[in-house]
Amino acid sequence: MKSTRPFHPTPVITIDGPTASGKGTVAALVAAHLGFHLLDSGALYRLAALASMRYDIAAEDVDALVKLIDDLHITFREGCAQLDGVDVSNDIRAEAVGNRASAIAVHGPVRTALVARQRAFRKTPGLVADGRDMGTVIFPDAMLKVFLTASAEARAARRHKQLMQKGFSANIDDLLRDLRERDARDSNRAAAPLKPAADAKLLDTSALSVDEAVDQVLQWYRALGQPA
């Protein structure tokens, strides 16, 4: 059956999935392999939050927030989030920044502005976008949509390892409980619930290495007749 998906000259690969599924790592490596631009949609909200704090813009000042988001200079390179050319990957993980991101995201105009910024990352030669609704909401016409997941136990183990490597203490049972609670919230929310697009490729990475997951995404891309 011939696809009815609208044609766009700039290819997009979307990689959606739950927390700690490895989608960010896979997306960054796929983008690097293909020479594509990279979008970490989750970090985008935190970058906007960090910028609002640095410029003393109140979380309730919707007009100022929208203008700020429109003017932000944001790039993602090799897993690093840059604001005005400076790596702020660690800064945006602060609890205060996360709280501010939640506070500004409640405003409809702010979410609309952030959606526009996400779509603006679509530039030649192509884009790899990772998040939760990239294939369903932001880029419904993406050439390749991947929904990457893993068991809650595997994801908790990965997150625990990441935190320990960064010098943080963590209890794996607490992480597992938090992941399951977040999965339930994300899957049942009214706006853009976490779910695979109808035409997404499902990739369970519970028993896969990062390289194996990347290779599978690239195989799917090649199968579309694209050089990879």
UniProtKB/Swiss-Prot annotation:
GO terms for biological process: nucleobase-containing small molecule interconversion; pyrimidine nucleotide metabolic process. Belongs to the cytidylate kinase family. Type 1 subfamily. Its EC number is 2.7.4.25. It holds the Pfam family Cytidylate_kin. It comes from Burkholderia multivorans (strain ATCC 17616 / 249). The lineage of its organism: Bacteria, Pseudomonadati, Pseudomonadota, Betaproteobacteria, Burkholderiales. This is Cytidylate kinase. Keywords: ATP-binding, Cytoplasm, Kinase, Nucleotide-binding, Transferase. One of its GO terms (molecular function) is dCMP kinase activity.
